[in-house]
Amino acid sequence: DNTKAYSEAMKYFIIFALFIFLGVMFYIDILKYFVGPAYYPGLRVVPIVMLGELFFGIYFNLSLWYKLIDQTRWGAYFSTIGCVATVSIILLFGPSYGYMACAWASFFCNLLMMLLSYFVGQKKFPIEYDLKSAFLYFGVATVLYVAGMALPIQSEWLRLGYRTILLGVFIAFMVKRDLPLRELPYVGRFFR
């Protein structure tokens, strides 16, 4: 049954995408040195854009259904709706909010296309995705992200240490729940 494989692929995509999101956001204080200081004020769009791209990745995974049933026109429908949503948000809010409006436009466009593809796909070619795990991981990542960003730690080293611990919590949760390392031939002996 290939639908099980599609469901598993989606689950692990979400897990690792959230891990990357947390990693980038927790170490943004270091990663910012890869761009010039003139761009530092724009770093506030990074979490919005990253989540928007995560939604686009989920949409891309979901788009499999209309290819499998040879109804690729649905991709054109979703893309057109997403384009109209993006342009509308930018035209309405761009003059007042600048690049923040563009970031939010991308976020909402990708979220909308993801939701449309999921709900239409469940009617046309149902795949039983592990929504419980997806929401659980989004919830854990949200709590850890808020915990990592909300606590005002002045010392950069202490802040990075604290965020590293939080990222470790996510990794431990991921390993304990969905990555059975004990079943791997060589690595497994360390996790018995």
Specify the residue positions occupied by each region the protein language model found.
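Specific pore-lining/lateral-gate transmembrane helices of multi-pass inner-membrane transport
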Residues: D1-S79
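Residue-level recognition of pore/gate-forming positions within transmembrane alpha-helices
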Residues: A17, F21, E53, S79-V84, ...
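Membrane-embedded alpha-helical segments of multi-pass transporters/permeases
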Residues: F21-D29, V87, L91-L92, M114-Q122, ...
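Membrane-interfacial segments
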Residues: L31, V35, Y39, Y97, ...
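Hydrophobic alpha-helical interface/terminus motif in multipass membrane transporters
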Residues: L31-V35, Y66, F93, F108, ...
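Membrane-interface helix-loop junctions in multi-pass transport and translocation proteins
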Residues: L43, D70-R73, T80-L115, I127, ...
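Alpha-helical transmembrane segments
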Residues: L62-D70, Y118-K132
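Membrane-proximal transmembrane or re-entrant/amphipathic helices at the cytosolic face
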Residues: G148-R192
